[in-house]
Amino acid sequence: MTGPSAPSPPSGPSEPGPVGGPAPAAANAGAPAGAGGPGGGTAVEPRTALHAPTGRSWRAFLQPLAIIAIGGLWMLYVENSDLDSIAARVLAPDYVAQKTWEHIELAVVSTLLVLVIAIPLGVLLSRSWARPATPLVLAIANIGQSAPAIGVVVLLAVTFGIGFWTAIVALVAYGVLPALRNTLVGLQQVDPTLTDAGRGIGMSAARVLARVELPLATPVILAGIRTTLVLMVGTASIASFISGGGLGDLITTGVSTQRTPVLLTGCILIALLALLIDWLGGMAARLLAPKGL
């Protein structure tokens, strides 16, 4: 025997699912903002937020704008200063641009050589059969960075002579460690279950490295490249001691002739160039990092 049943609520075409269930929200998710009742507005919020401008995107460009502003103000100050003939000749725009380009060449060429050496070496040392040699290789790389940079430059100049390529060899010896260590750390922190899954579906060891390990290690490797670039920009100033060129020539000229504006111009330009390279490296890391990491 059944009792009296409760009156059923009126049903309409606007209620495709049970009351309080996910169906109404799913039905209203595609509705435009402000339509579809009170549930529709809540469902649309995440979609609209994806296209709304954020303060973070604007802050990303504050650093290069500040670098350009500081560099422009300093050069404007130098041009309007009362300089003698020596300082005016050294701080001529053409000469400063030439030394800046030489400095960029030193940093970029040395960084490329570091990456050609460090990344393949890091990949090899991350393999199980090569791990016993890892401490020895890292110790050798540590020697290059722990030794005073000026001492390495002078030693190489005595051995191979002075010039651009001697400075490049010194910079490469000084910059291998960050890129090598980051490559090793990035590959070693890959979850072993992911590599086992790749082998389980029939991938070869080379394909697991290319399709699983390297993409997952990319953010750490890119951080090492960024560190190496900034390190090379700062250390390239020592090339002036062996006629390697670069903005270090402004510093040595300013010290030897006791011209403070020349000395400060070299220091400020090197610092601004390092900050600009750091910003470019950060932007490249965001663009090149695999999606979802």
Give the ranges of each region predicted by the language model.
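Transmembrane alpha-helices
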Residues: 173, 205-239, 261, 265, ...
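Short cytoplasmic-facing helical segments at TM-TM junctions of multi-pass membrane proteins
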Residues: 179-227, 240, 247-251, 290-291
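N-terminal, non-cleaved signal-anchor transmembrane helix
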Residues: 1-112, 289-293
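Cytoplasmic-entry segments and transmembrane alpha-helices of multi-pass inner-membrane transporters
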Residues: 121-156, 181-189, 196
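Membrane-interfacial helix termini and adjacent extracytoplasmic/periplasmic loops
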Residues: 138, 150-181, 185, 203, ...
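Loop-to-helix entry region at the N-terminal start of transmembrane alpha-helices
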Residues: 98-110, 157-178, 218, 262, ...
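Faces of alpha-helical transmembrane segments in polytopic inner-membrane proteins
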Residues: 117, 141-149, 169-184, 188, ...
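Glycine-rich helix-loop "coupling/hinge" segments at transmembrane-helix boundaries
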Residues: 158, 235-270, 289-293
